[in-house]
């Protein structure tokens, strides 16, 4: 079956999903969560095959962590689907209304986008998360995962499709692309008359390929080169907590810190504290000349290090003379994802917030809060770094659009 045929079937199924009631979607998502629990053993066995193949290829620890499933993570995925089930249904919400002088009633109403192509790497949980969010928002979803997770993704998709069948919803509403050739993905990205939106999540190469070749609208979930700037006025204990949480708790996450910027006035006090805490957590440090003047034992940082999304226990450090230099560094090397300032200076905090165009800006809070669940969205399909209708963590509302609904009593314009 061609990718175009699969997409057409998904579009037809999406029409069915778009008309499901909030109660029906709630029940469907609960059933999808139960299906994952029922099929957990088969899913974990499939994941073990993917992990074995990945280790044989010499895959790094960060990627293995993204790929791996266990009982705890499976329970978390099922729980996440139940959380999505409990979220308010955005479809049909009226976001604005007014009665015009001629008596017509003008409303803006949320409606599903249609068919969403999710293109991603490594993370099998995205298969379930994306399916749940898209269906809750009334959409069909085409899932194109990476070859490294093909067995896991297939097992998860089969379980979820079983729940769709039981609910008399066409299983094409959740379509998994099993042909992983690059040409097939390219063909999918050309189907702008069928697919309404493509969301790539993964490495820089994948996202660039999708952005450069798609005729379908694309919301990029670009790499997370996230910074922490420790200002001269910062509470050093607070800054250290932000640094440890942002770098050492889950370095493979896109909201983990990759670069530390330290004001020169506090470098000699803060850097030794930071180095000791990070060494205890096996973090490799790389710094500029000013950093190495305080920490001579660490490796020098290259220009490439400051633009890198390490996704590992590696941190680039630079000492800066002032806030303006920190802002300039972030603008040059950042990826518009998440930036953090540790400061007790309210004016500097406000300047930091206003001067950066990043999707999420934190003041005295960990970069790890750059997450849909943590920010009150309930769940996210990813973190958009594209300045379109959704910027930053994308929840259910980002998977809908607003259209005008006009109600009248026979009014005409002329």
Curated annotation (Swiss-Prot):
It is found in: Cytoplasm. One of its GO terms (molecular function) is NADP binding. Its EC number is 1.2.1.41. Its main location: cytoplasm. It holds the Pfam family Aldedh. One of its GO terms (biological process) is L-proline biosynthetic process. Gene3D superfamilies: Aldehyde Dehydrogenase, Chain A, domain 1, Aldehyde Dehydrogenase, Chain A, domain 2. Keywords: Amino-acid biosynthesis, Cytoplasm, NADP, Oxidoreductase, Proline biosynthesis. It catalyses: L-glutamate 5-semialdehyde + phosphate + NADP(+) = L-glutamyl 5-phosphate + NADPH + H(+). Pathway: Amino-acid biosynthesis; L-proline biosynthesis; L-glutamate 5-semialdehyde from L-glutamate: step 2/2. SUPFAM superfamilies: ALDH-like. GO terms for cellular component: cytoplasm. Catalyzes the NADPH-dependent reduction of L-glutamate 5-phosphate into L-glutamate 5-semialdehyde and phosphate. The product spontaneously undergoes cyclization to form 1-pyrroline-5-carboxylate. HAMAP family: ProA. Belongs to the gamma-glutamyl phosphate reductase family. This is Gamma-glutamyl phosphate reductase. It comes from Xanthomonas axonopodis pv. citri (strain 306). The lineage of its organism: Bacteria, Pseudomonadati, Pseudomonadota, Gammaproteobacteria, Lysobacterales. The gene is proA.
């Amino acid at each position: 079956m061609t990718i175009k045929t699969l997409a057409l079937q998904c579009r037809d199924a999406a029409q069915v999903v778009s008309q499901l009631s909030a109660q029906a979607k709630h029940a469907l998502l609960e059933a999808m969560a139960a299906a994952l629990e029922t099929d957990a053993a088969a899913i974990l066995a499939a994941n073990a095959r993917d992990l074995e193949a990945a280790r044989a290829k010499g895959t790094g620890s960060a990627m293995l962590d993204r790929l791996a499933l266990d009982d705890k993570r499976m329970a978390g995925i099922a729980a996440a689907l139940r959380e999505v089930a409990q979220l308010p249904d955005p479809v049909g919400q009226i976001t604005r209304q007014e009665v015009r002088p001629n008596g017509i009633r003008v409303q803006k109403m949320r409606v599903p986008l249609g068919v969403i192509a999710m293109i991603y790497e490594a993370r099998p949980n995205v298969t379930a998360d994306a399916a749940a969010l898209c269906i809750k928002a009334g959409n069909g979803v085409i899932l194109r995962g990476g070859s490294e997770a093909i067995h896991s993704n297939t097992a998860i998709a089969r379980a979820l499709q079983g729940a769709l069948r039981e609910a008399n919803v066409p299983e094409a509403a959740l379509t998994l692309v099993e042909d992983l050739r690059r040409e097939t993905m390219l063909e999918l990205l050309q189907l702008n008359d069928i697919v309404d939106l493509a969301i790539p999540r993964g490495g820089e190469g994948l996202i660039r390929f999708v952005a450069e070749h798609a005729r379908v609208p694309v919301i990029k979930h670009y790499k997370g080169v996230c910074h922490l700037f420790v200002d001269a006025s910062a509470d050093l204990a607070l800054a250290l907590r932000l640094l440890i949480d942002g770098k050492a708790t889950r370095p493979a996450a896109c909201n983990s810190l990759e670069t530390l910027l330290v004001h020169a006035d506090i470098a000699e006090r803060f850097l030794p504290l930071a180095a000791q805490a990070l060494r205890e957590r096996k973090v490799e440090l790389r710094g500029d000349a000013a950093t190495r003047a305080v920490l001579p034992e660490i490796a020098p940082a290259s220009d490439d290090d400051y633009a890198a999304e390490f996704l590992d226990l590696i941190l680039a450090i630079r000492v800066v003379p002032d806030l303006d230099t920190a802002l300039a560094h972030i603008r040059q090397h950042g990826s518009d994802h998440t930036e953090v300032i540790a400061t007790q200076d309210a004016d500097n905090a406000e300047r930091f917030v206003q001067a950066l165009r990043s999707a999420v800006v934190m003041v005295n809070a960990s970069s790890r809060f750059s997450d849909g669940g943590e920010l009150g969205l309930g769940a996210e399909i990813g973190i958009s770094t594209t300045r379109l209708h959704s910027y930053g963590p994308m929840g259910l509302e980002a998977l809908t659009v607003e259209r005008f609904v006009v109600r009248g009593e026979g009014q005409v314009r002329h």
